[in-house]
From Swiss-Prot:
Record's subcellular location: Plastid, Chloroplast
Natural source organism: Physcomitrium patens (Spreading-leaved earth moss)
Catalytic activity: RNA(n) + a ribonucleoside 5'-triphosphate = RNA(n+1) + diphosphate
Protein name: DNA-directed RNA polymerase subunit beta''
Pfam families in UniProt: RNA_pol_Rpb1_4, RNA_pol_Rpb1_5
GO BP, one annotated term: DNA-templated transcription
Residues in the signal sequence: none
Gene: rpoC2
Length: 1330
């Protein structure tokens, strides 16, 4: 007996009790433990241990640990504000920082108690294992730590206080959900564990040890592990299935139990593996034998006959269910959890490696790192030392080449060999301010959300929200102010007029749901002027597709013609013939289908030819209608056949049924079936189009175009489906429409011609399926008109205007195309003045007071109107840029002040009932040069600057003695602005105020350019908070530069950057207005999971119920390597297929046991393998019959016992074909030999009715049915059946010994007789020869 001289905690007590039982037995062990209990009570009484609040001592290191964690959190928040990390990376940093702080504080508790107060009651109770755990004490004297929200996500605000210090109100509210969830989870887990125990006991309640040896020859191979006591402990108490030989010497024989000494010997001799017996391989049908079960865990010796090991196994697995948790790990990302080890530097030095062998990436915390493709050689150099090391492939490098590293610094993280289980999780990012969305990265429209504002981010980039006050009331039909207008406080912004008369135009309004907003007009004819006469060139009906501003660029599509002969009403497949198609999508190759409301690509036809449509009949049914389908898949039906009760086939053809998402798609392919004689020779004709008159299979001639499709149903059933094909021809017309430019537009230059080219587009790819809804049609070919002109002309835009001409009292609509000349400021060298001419037009409207109601929206603050740059939105959406959204930065001074906008030009507006309303509208006669003022549309910064100080008048009523000139003199103040040249360098200009002498003429003199140029600040440039440039002060806010003044001050529009990774989903369009709290981005990231999304008790239940967890095997590569060794021996053998099925079933049993053990061991629960093996044995004890056996009486698909099937196959002449099946514990409980047990479990009425109809007999073999009927349960060492079984076993052994002795005696007699006969035979033969 060993002498213990140490602290006896829970683990030490367990080891002591185990050794006492092994050496002295249970009786003496009970006496010794009773003495230990008495000593413990005596010492506890003398110590008088009590627990008070003063015994809760907080570790002194807590304050600086929390301070350090807060500093790390502040740094993370700063990087997030700068846009360097996104929300998920920030959350990971906070979680791991506070988790590490909490764990370090937990480790500091025990040393602190030992040094300050070793006899502290809290310390003695918790760390001895008597009461309480380390985690519970940590919440009393350490910190509460991180908590989860109702969605299961971890809250990034930890509870820094403990229960000794007391929680604040915020901390208490945060902890409420987690605390209540713990109570609820405990109750739920208790009930779930109870029900799981009931199901487990139900499936194995009849398993009793009845025999000593079942005589099985099968075994299970296990490997003893070095220095792993827990895994080797499961070998102790098992029975050997084969002899063990070490160097030719037998150290253990078959049917010998494995003891601790034998395991130690196997480890010392480095035995690779041994064969043991298991309940999985026991040959007994209803019971189990002693040798397959092994030792009793209670007594430490061989299990006795009559023990109800099934009940023990069920309770052993179900009882620890309350200890399992339901938590999910909330960290993840690049290499999270799959880091095998860290590589550290041995000394200070400079690290060097090949930079071409690595590529950059981001760590899970957003820090820069590099991944090596192959094994990377790294050299660390110092003045006196040189160290070489190899970093494995796919490892993460945390340093750069030629960087100085310190001793013990982590330079790389090595990836684990087995990747952990992860799941993809979405995290929503919400806007912190109202404003306008902007992005600069490449964003593509999501194909899954064609008709929405969902976009996908191709690569990592920033999403900006430009600040602005959002007006929630957007129902106003008319806005007084235009983009960039200055707005005073309490002035009307917009007006809504109800019940008034308005002019009706001859064209439709904008389609706001279109991605490319446009004006669509119908019934226009294109005319060409020849000899002063108009001749009609195009008589078709074109649909004009024009921008809002009426400006077209070169090669723009402005009209579309849908030819009726290319319009189809039946579904089918498109097949290209000899047409040549440009498959590269360009600017004009995307359009929106108004009928299907989807955006599709279109492909330009380069060469005329033909294409084909393979017609099909398609029906889509929901999942609930699957039972009403009356036709079979891969069948051939005639026209008029009922497909469902309400649908009949219109054509004769081949039926294909496929499941598409949650619906079923039924396709009927018209045609005829042909079975070729030579399949290999005719297989080359698969998928080809055959013209009329050509031979098919050297037997028939085609009358029309046909398509051959090879269909394979099985190995021996394949044929050709001859399908009809509809031909469509494409013919080009190479006569472009030419329109001359009116002479008055360009008198001095040579006349230039505008060309309208006709281009045909096909809307579907080759082999693409076309599905058409009932009562609809789809266009296949579009004819488009493209505007073009001579390339020598330096004109980039053309303007389209509409004209109404009255001819003989009939008004007809025409349109005119004019080329637009851009104003070039630098070409006017002689004249330094640019004159802007504005025309005031008077309009008279007489409005009846009874029919008109006016609603005005008043401004709450003064600022600047900002129209969003997204053209998909209606005009009534607008932002007001107030001084709270702008700030001015003086580059020489670090002070910050609000922007004072002096450019105040207002619009005139008056309203008087039953009188003339006078409105003065300002219109530009020509485009003005682009100023570097406040930004307009952000898509094209250099072409969107306007002089907003001269646009509108303020909305005020006009008095009778009103003077416009006096008002203008008071309001207008012209500032000094900048221009941008092509190189985007800032150039200073001076704009001075000019006295207004004429109402129709303003002039602004422009002086020479300034000499100073700089490239430090560009208009429209985005920058983050904390940016510092050269000698200028640091920017204190993130934003966008929207104006630059001559005093070197910047006007900055406040903005908020959000970092998003590639693959993120953006929920708004470019330039769209978003409100505070709206969803901006959905980040997709990976999160660790423990084997599966379901964990703990639900995971165990999922495995025991045999539910599908993964469609593909997790350890596919490893399993294939192991099984391949055995499979190679079976290929080419008739029995190989049967043996492979048996091996796969045995391997599945072992894998299922390991998976269940993995869940329990991850939670610190140890269960003997033999208990789980008994459950798995019952789950795999049934097989499915495959064929209808008239002689054996089994139906196809019937569940029978595996042992019964093997026994009948040995007895019957005709074998029963069957396949193995894995049943869940619930289904296995409902498929037993006792219908009484099944009825008492579930579905009582169904089970009893089925048993009555089949005439089943219950032989009362199990425990449950005997309890129900009040009989004696057939278990226990004193049971009559067990005693009779023991007597029968003894008599059987005696009989076997007698038979063996008789057999040996008869064999000896036979040997002597054979020897005597052989001697006499040889002597006679020799005598004859002589």
């Amino acid at each position: 007996m060993l002498f213990y001289n140490k602290v006896m905690d829970r683990t030490a007590i367990k080891q002591l009790i185990s050794r006492l039982i092994t050496h002295f037995g249970i009786t003496y062990t009970t006496y010794i433990l009773d003495q230990l209990k008495t000593v413990g009570f005596k010492q506890a009484t003398q110590a008088a241990i009590s627990l008070g609040i003063d015994d809760l001592l907080t570790a002194p290191s807590k304050s600086w640990l929390i301070q350090d964690a807060e500093q790390q959190g502040y740094i993370s928040e700063k990087h997030y504000r700068y846009g360097n990390v996104h929300a998920v990376e920030k959350l990971r940093q906070l979680i791991e920082t506070w988790y590490a702080t909490s764990e370090y504080l937990k480790q500091e508790m025990n040393p602190n108690f030992r040094m300050t107060d070793p006899l502290n009651p809290v310390h003695m109770m918790s760390f001895s294992g008597a009461r309480g755990s380390t985690s519970q004490v940590h919440q009393l004297v350490g910190m509460r730590g991180l908590m989860s929200d109702p969605q299961g996500q971890i809250i990034d605000l930890p509870i820094q206080s403990n229960f000794r210090e007391g929680l604040s109100l915020t901390e208490y509210i945060i902890s409420c959900y987690g605390a209540r969830k713990g109570v609820v989870d405990t109750a739920v887990r208790t009930s779930d564990a109870g029900y799981l125990t009931r199901r487990l006991v139900e499936v194995v309640q009849h398993i009793v040890v009845r025999k000593v040896d079942c005589g099985t020859s099968e075994n299970i191979f296990v490997t003893p592990l070095q220095n792993n006591y827990k895994k080797n402990n499961k070998l102790i108490g098992r029975i050997l299935a084969d002899n063990i030989y070490i160097n030719g010497r037998c150290i253990a024989i078959r049917n010998q139990d494995i003891t601790t000494n034998l395991v130690i010997s196997l480890i010392n001799f480095q035995r690779k593996g041994i064969f043991i017996r298991s309940p999985l391989i026991c040959k007994s049908m209803l019971w189990i034998c002693q040798l397959c079960y092994g030792w009793s865990l209670t007594h430490g010796n061989l299990i006795e006959l009559g023990e109800a090991v099934g009940i023990i196994a069920g309770q052993s697995i179900g009882e620890p269910g309350t200890q399992l948790t339901l938590r999910t790990f909330h960290t993840g990302g690049v290499f999270t959890g799959d880091i095998a080890e860290h590589i550290r530097t041995p000394f200070n030095g400079i690290i060097q490696f090949d930079t071409n062998s690595v590529y950059p990436t981001r760590t899970r915390h957003g820090h820069p790192a590099w991944i090596c493709n192959n094994n990377l050689s790294v050299v660390i150099k110092s003045k006196k030392k040189l160290h070489n090391l190899v970093i494995p492939t796919q490892s993460l490098l945390l340093v750069q080449s030629n960087q100085y590293v310190e001793s013990k610094q982590v330079i790389a993280e090595v990836r684990a060999k087995t990747s952990p289980f992860k799941e993809k999780v979405q995290k929503y990012i919400y806007s912190n301010l109202s404003g306008e969305m902007h992005w600069s990265s490449k964003v593509q429209h999501s194909s899954e959300y064609i008709h929405s504002n969902v976009h996908l981010l191709r690569k990592t980039g920033h999403i900006w929200i430009l600040a602005g006050n959002f007006d929630k009331d957007n129902k106003f039909s008319f806005i007084f102010y235009q983009n960039q207008d200055k707005l005073d406080n309490k002035l009307p912004i917009a007006k809504q007029t109800l019940n008034y008369f308005q002019l009706k135009e001859h064209f439709l309004n904008n389609f706001w749901n279109s991605i490319y907003s446009s004006i669509i007009l119908y019934n226009y004819r294109f005319l060409e002027k020849k000899n002063n006469k108009y001749e009609k060139k195009l008589l078709f009906q074109f649909m004009l597709k024009l921008p809002k501003n009426g400006i077209l660029k070169q090669n723009d599509i402005f009209a579309i013609f849908n030819d009726p002969k290319y319009r189809i009403k039946n579904s089918g497949i498109i097949k290209y013939g000899n047409i040549k198609v440009d498959l590269i999508n360009k600017k004009n190759d995307i359009f929106e289908d108004q009928k299907t409301k989807t955006v599709r690509p279109r492909y330009k036809i380069l060469k005329e030819g033909n294409f084909f449509l393979l017609p099909e009949e398609v029906y889509i049914l929901d999942q609930s209608s699957f039972s009403s389908i009356l036709v079979k898949n891969n069948s051939f039906i005639k026209a008029g056949t009922k497909i469902t009760f309400n649908i009949s086939s219109k054509i004769t053809g081949f039926v294909k049924i496929k499941k598409k998402f949650n619906n079923f798609k039924i396709k009927i392919l018209p045609g005829s079936i042909y079975y070729p004689k030579e399949k290999q020779k005719n297989f080359k004709q698969n998928g080809i189009l055959i013209p009329p008159g050509e031979k098919i299979f050297e037997q028939f001639r085609a009358k029309n175009w046909i398509y051959l499709e090879w269909i394979v149903l099985s190995k021996d059933n394949s044929f050709f489906l001859i399908r009809p094909a509809i031909e469509y021809k494409i013919i080009f017309n190479d006569n472009p429409l030419t329109l001359p430019i009116p002479f008055y537009l360009d008198l001095l230059k040579e006349q230039k011609k505008i060309k309208i080219q006709t281009v045909k587009y096909i809307l579907y790819e080759d082999s693409e399926e076309v599905e058409i809804n009932p009562d609809t049609d789809i266009q296949l070919i579009q004819t488009c008109l493209i505007l073009n002109w001579e390339t020598k002309v330096f004109i980039k835009e053309a303007h389209i205007s509409f004209i109404k001409i009255r001819i003989n009292k009939i008004i007809k609509n025409f349109f005119q195309i004019n080329l637009i000349e851009n104003i070039n400021l630098m070409n006017k060298k002689k004249n330094n003045n640019i004159i802007l001419n504005y025309l005031f037009k008077k309009k008279r409207y007489i409005i009846n007071q009874k029919d008109c109601e006016k609603i005005l929206l008043l401004s709450k603050t003064w600022g600047i109107i900002r129209t969003p740059s997204n053209k998909n939105q209606e005009k009534s959406f607008f932002l007001i840029l107030s001084p709270f959204n702008l700030f001015q930065t003086i580059l020489f001074d670090k002070t910050k002040q609000n922007l004072k906008i002096e450019n105040n030009v207002e619009k005139l507006f008056t309203y008087e009932p039953k009188k003339i309303i006078k409105t003065f509208n300002i219109e530009k006669r020509k485009n003005f040069v682009e100023f570097l003022g406040l930004l307009g549309y952000l898509q094209n910064i250099t072409k969107s600057f306007q002089l907003f100080s001269c646009k509108k008048f303020s909305d005020k009523s006009i008095p009778i003695n009103f003077s416009i000139i006096d008002n203008l003199k008071k309001k207008i103040k012209i500032s000094k602005w900048f221009f941008l040249n092509e190189n985007k360098k800032v150039q200073k200009f001076f704009l001075t105020q000019n006295t207004i002498l004429s109402l129709l003429n303003w002039s602004f003199p422009i002086f020479d350019l300034a000499k100073k140029k700089t490239q430090l600040f560009n208009l429209g440039h985005f920058f983050c908070d904390g940016l510092s440039i050269a000698e200028y002060p640091t920017f204190s806010e993130s934003g966008q530069i929207i104006a630059i003044y001559d005093d070197l001050s910047l006007v900055i529009r406040l903005a908020k950057p959000y970092l998003a990774t590639g693959g993120a989903i953006i929920h708004n369009n470019y330039g769209e207005i978003v409100k505070e709290g709206d969803i901006l981005i959905t980040l997709i990231y990976e999160r660790l999971k423990s084997g599966d999304i379901i964990q703990g008790l639900p995971k165990v239940e999922q495995l025991l119920e045999a539910r599908l967890t993964n469609p593909v095997s997790i350890n596919l590569e490893k399993g294939f390597g192991e099984w391949n060794k055995d499979m190679t021996n079976f290929f080419g053998s008739l029995w190989g297929y049967f043996l492979s099925a048996q091996i796969s079933m045995e391997q599945s049993q072992v894998n299922l046991v390991n998976q269940i053990q993995k869940v329990y061991r991850s939670q610190g629960v140890n269960i003997s393998d033999k208990h789980i093996e008994i459950i798995v044995r019952q789950m795999t004890s049934k097989v499915f019959t495959l064929e209808d056996g008239m002689t054996n009486g089994f139906l196809p698909g019937e569940l029978i016992e595996f042992a019964r099937a093997k026994r009948m196959n040995r007895a019957l002449e005709e074998v029963i074909p069957y396949k193995p099946v894995l049943l869940g514990i619930t289904k296995a409980s409902l498929n037993t030999q006792s219908f009484i047990s099944e009825a008492s479990f579930q579905e009582t009425t169904r089970v009893l009715a089925k048993a009555a109809l089949r005439g089943r007999i219950d032989w009362l073999k199990g425990l449950k049915e005997n309890v129900i009927l009040g009989g004696i349960i057939p278990t226990g060492t004193g049971c009559e059946e067990v005693l009779w079984q023991i007597t029968l076993e003894k008599q059987k052994n005696i009989l076997l010994k007698k038979n063996k002795s008789k057999l040996f005696h008869n064999k000896v007699k036979d040997i002597f007789l054979y020897k005597k006969l052989s001697i006499s035979f040889t002597s006679e033969k020799i005598h004859k020869n002589y």
